[in-house]
Amino acid sequence: MVAITAGNASVRFTGFFSESKSMSDSFNTRKQFTAGDRSFDFFSLKALEEQHPSVATLPYAQKILLENLLRHEDGSNVSKSDIEALANWDAKAEPDTEIAFTPARVVLQDFTGVPAVVDLAAMRDAMANLGGSPDKINPLSPAELVIDHSVMVDEYGSSGAFDLNAKLEFNRNKERYAFLRWGQGAFDNFKVVPPDTGIVHQVNLEFLARVVFGNEQTNLAYPDTLVGTDSHTTMINGVGVLGWGVGGIEAEAAMLGQPITMLIPQVVGFKLSGKLAEGCTATDLVLTVTEMLRNKGVVGKFVEFFGDGLADLPLADRATIANMAPEYGATCGIFPVDGETIRYMELTARPKEQCQLVEAYAKAQGMWREDGQPDAQYSDVMELDMSTVQPSLAGPKRPQDRVLLSDMQKTYQREVKSFVKDRQDKDDKSMAEAREEGEGGTPSKSVGGSAPVKYRDAEFNLQDGSVVIAAITSCTNTSNPA
C-alpha cells in the first residue's frame, strides 16, 4: 500500500502495483519436483498430508483451493488456521468458514473489459496528477481480454459472409479496438485477443489455459485458476482449471491482486460410468446431467466429476458439461487432470515442456486421475451410467427442460396448445398493444400459426411445428465437434 500526496490531495493505492510481500510457510510444504529436464518449487500437498492425513481424501477442487491457501499464507488474508480448516474439511458440514481465494489470472470479454481498462487508465491519470509514476499502475494478475461480445452478423448464407462481417466489425468498433490496442501496449500483464478469433470460452480453453503455471522468475509451479466476466467461464473446468464467472468489480479486484472471499464450499461428486451409446452426443449427456443436478439442487456448491467413465469421455465433451454449470446451478463443474487432459493439450499445440509440467505437477500433488483409484470424500454423490443416456432435446423454453427425442411428438402436441392459447388471448394482446402505443411503439400484424418466408428463389410458409435449421451461436458447443 502506498500513499501519494500532492498539496492537500492524497490518494491511497492498494494492490495496484508490485510490492514485496512476506509470505509464510507454517507447514514447511515448499518442496521441489522435476518436469522433463527442469526443476520447480511447489507447495506440496503430500507434505501437508503427513501432518493432516485427511488431505489425501480431499476432492480435486478442494486440493486446488488448499494449495492456493498454502501459497498465499501471509498471516493476514490467509492464516494458518484457514489452511487447517480446509485440510481437515468436513464434507458433510454446512459451510461456515471463510477463506481468501486468489485466482492466478482473469479472463475478460470486451463488454466488461473495456470499463476495466478505462479504470486502469484513470488510475494512471490520478497517479500522474499526484506526482507519482503512472507506469506503476498495472494489473498484478495476468488479465486476458477476448473480443467477442461486440460481434454482429450483418451478412450470412454466403461464402464471403465472414470477411464482410469482419470488415464491418472493425469499422463499427474502430475507436474501441484502438483503445484496447493501446491498453495492451501500455499495461504489463494485460493481453488482448483480437476479434474474429473465437468465443471467449473457446479461446480460453484452446489457447489461454496453462493448466499449471511455471513461473520463471520465482521458479514456482502452481495450478492455473481464474475468474471471468461471463457466467459460462466454467467451461475451463473441463481441462482441470478451477474458475467461474464473477461481476466486473470482482474481476477488477482480482486483476489488482485482491483475493476473493468465499465460504469453503460443499462438493457434490458426480460419478460417471460406462460410455455413450452409438448415436448419442455430448449434448444428450449434458442435458441429462443438467436435469439430474437441477433436481438435486447444487446452488452455491462445487460439482466434481469422477469415476472410470471419464476414460471414455473426450475433453471436448467434458468442456460441454462444464460449460453448463450455470444452468445446473453450481459454482463450477470440474474434471480432474488425467491422460485425456494431456492428449488435448498436445492436440491444441501446447509446447511439449508445458505438457510435461502439467503431468509431473499433477502426479507430484496427488491430483492425477487414474482408473481404479480410491474415491475422494464428497458432501454428496450422484451416479450416472452413460450407456443409459438417450437422444434428447432441450426446451421448449429452458435448457434444463429435457425432452426425450422419442417423446418429442406428444410433448410438442401438448406444448403447442398452450402457445396457441396465448396467441388467441385477445385481452392480453389488446393490453400489450395499448402499452406499446403509449410508449411510442407500433403494433405489428399477428402472423397467426404460419408466416410466409422467401429465401433466395423459393417461397413457402413456416407453420407451428416446422423443423428448421437456425444459425444460432452457442458457446456451449463451441469447442466440441459433436
Where are these regions (language model features)?
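Compositionally biased low-complexity segments, especially N-terminal hydrophobic helices
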Residues: 1-7
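Glycine-centered signal
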Residues: 4, 15-17
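Fe-S-dependent hydro-lyases/dehydratases of central metabolism
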Residues: 17-482
